[in-house]
Amino acid sequence: MRGVGQLALHSTDPSRAAEFYESAFGFRRRAADDGGVDLELGGFELSFRRAERPARDGMQLGFRVDTAAEVDAWAQELSQRGFALLGPASGDRWEGTRSFRVSDPDGRQVAIFYHYPA
């Protein structure tokens, strides 16, 4: 096994959800039909399937970056492009992680994070 390659999520509006991830994080649309939308980024597939209501079970998606400075750069870029951050980028080497979060159109939290080496 090489790792996780695909995640499928419920969405009340798969096209709207896909547009958020395309615009915010650079995903590319692979396929779309009445039932949903498939996106891809770096070999990872993120799919949205139509549902009457999204599953709100505390799920959070996280995108790992290579440096703490990248966390700050992503936070600044998304904020400047009009995405509402749920709080400023926070955390340091002492805490072990630096991150920030935004909400997607279905209310899921999406984090950009960096883990400092131990």
Question: At which residue positions do the language-model features occur?
Answer:
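N-terminal beta-strand motif that seeds the catalytic metal site of vicinal oxygen chelate
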Residues: 1-15, 58-63, 116-118
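Vicinal oxygen chelate
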Residues: 76, 80-118
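Residue-level marker for the onset of beta-strands and adjacent loop->beta junctions
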Residues: 5, 34-35, 59, 96-98
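Conserved short beta-strand elements that form part of the metal-binding/catalytic scaffold
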Residues: 28-59, 65, 109-114
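Short amphipathic alpha-helices within nucleic acid-binding modules
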Residues: 69-76
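Core segments of cupin and vicinal oxygen chelate
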Residues: 2, 8-46
